[in-house]
């Protein structure tokens, strides 16, 4: 179920040469179809069923602006730009009972990336011995030193936290372009981009395994 509110404004100036539109929206979706995760064992089900148990909301804005300038009866040019900004937040996804609040998806963007917090590099063997134990392999001086977020003396998957701007969905998309027209000939260009998005860069792989 989706409930969306939208408000916008548009205008034209200078004999319709300059035109723009801007919209703002707020969208709430509930009863999202998701797999259950908290059914008790006495339910007696072999496979966990799906149900309408999710809720999230999104908000944002989009707009465009253009300017058309006739030079003479045969020539003219037009420049334009547009943008779309959108943010989504999980309000309630059924989840396991996590030991730490930062492990939950609720209250955070959908598909947010998680990772360890790097505090620098180990400078000596003595620093390694006096630091929380890093559980991802043997550590040597020069290796990355990760933060023990929960303070239990070891660095493991329980210390993975949501990363700033760590969202696999672009929050901002934009573009701009221009056209030049002479009689029946039009030459133009268009540039598009996205921002506020991150991806994990996976390692290289060959026949022997990960490099």
Segments from the language model and where they lie:
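Transmembrane beta-strands of outer-membrane beta-barrel proteins
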Residues: 18-20, 77-79, 176, 182, ...
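Strand-loop-strand
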Residues: 99-102, 187, 193-197
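Extracellular/periplasmic, surface-exposed regions of secreted and cell-surface proteins
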Residues: 1-113
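Extracytoplasmic gating/loop element in the C-terminal half of outer-membrane beta-barrel translocons
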Residues: 141, 194-211
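Conserved small-residue
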Residues: 54, 68-168, 208-209
């Amino acid at each position: 179920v989706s409930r969306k509110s939208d408000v916008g404004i548009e205008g034209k100036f200078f004999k319709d040469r300059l035109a723009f539109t801007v919209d703002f929206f707020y969208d709430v979706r509930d009863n999202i179809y998701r797999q259950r995760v908290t059914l008790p064992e006495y339910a007696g089900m072999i496979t966990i069923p799906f149900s309408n148990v999710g809720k999230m909301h999104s908000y944002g804005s989009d707009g465009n602006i253009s300017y058309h300038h006739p030079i003479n009866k045969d020539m003219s040019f037009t420049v334009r730009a547009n943008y779309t900004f959108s943010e989504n937040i999980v309000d309630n996804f059924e989840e396991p009972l996590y030991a730490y609040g930062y492990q939950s998806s609720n209250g955070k963007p959908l598909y947010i990336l998680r990772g360890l917090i790097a505090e620098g590099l180990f400078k000596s063997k003595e620093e390694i011995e006096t630091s929380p134990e890093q559980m991802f392999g043997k550590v040597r001086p020069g290796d990355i030193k990760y933060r023990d977020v929960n303070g239990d003396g070891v660095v493991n998957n329980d210390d993975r936290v949501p990363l700033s701007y760590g969202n696999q969905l672009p929050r901002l998309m934009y573009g701009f372009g221009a056209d030049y027209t002479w009689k029946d000939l039009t030459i133009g260009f268009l540039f598009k981009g996205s921002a506020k998005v991150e991806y994990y860069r996976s390692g290289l792989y060959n026949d022997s395994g990960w490099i």
